[in-house]
Amino acid sequence: MAKKTRRVVKRKKKIAVDHGVVHIKSSYNNTIITLTDPDGKVITWGSGGTAGFQGTRKGTPYAAQLAADQVAKEAVKLGIKKVDILVKGPGSGREAAIRTFQAAGLEIGTIKDVTPIPFNGCRPKKKRV
């Protein structure tokens, strides 16, 4: 007779943080929003895909708004009151996500644009005609 295997279920640890950092990475194809504690440990995250969108619609501001709403609700549920926002990338979901965090009742400390800009790094691709 085959041996029965037991599944081990890991329980989430209780997080006692009242201040968080929201990382918004917005590309042309998707927007990924991650909520971390000040040390950088991930608390929760969401994206256009987890909000239920597929394909090109993941890159829309509405998809970013719904993803930010999911993350903001989880943050409020965990007792986070104040957030700092770090925005990276050129996508269309940046402003929509920031507005959603304001509307959710979270106090916003700072908003920083941390988009990487090269100091004359790699040669860019040739222009399309």
Swiss-Prot record:
Under PANTHER family, the record lists: 40S RIBOSOMAL PROTEIN S14/30S RIBOSOMAL PROTEIN S11 (PTHR11759)
Which gene is the coding source of this polypeptide chain?
rpsK
Matching PROSITE patterns, A to Z?
A: RIBOSOMAL_S11 (PS00054)
Assembly notes? Part of the 30S ribosomal subunit. Interacts with proteins S7 and S18. Binds to IF-3.
Q: Which GO terms describe its cellular component?
A: ribonucleoprotein complex; ribosome
Can you say what this protein is called? Small ribosomal subunit protein uS11
Job of this protein: Located on the platform of the 30S subunit, it bridges several disparate RNA helices of the 16S rRNA. Forms part of the Shine-Dalgarno cleft in the 70S ribosome.
InterPro entries to which the protein is assigned, alphabetical: Ribosomal_uS11, Ribosomal_uS11_bac-type, Ribosomal_uS11_CS, Ribosomal_uS11_sf
Gene3D superfamilies, sorted: Ribosomal protein S11 (3.30.420.80)
Print the keywords alphabetically: Ribonucleoprotein, Ribosomal protein, RNA-binding, rRNA-binding
What is the organism field in this record? Thermosipho melanesiensis (strain DSM 12029 / CIP 104789 / BI429)
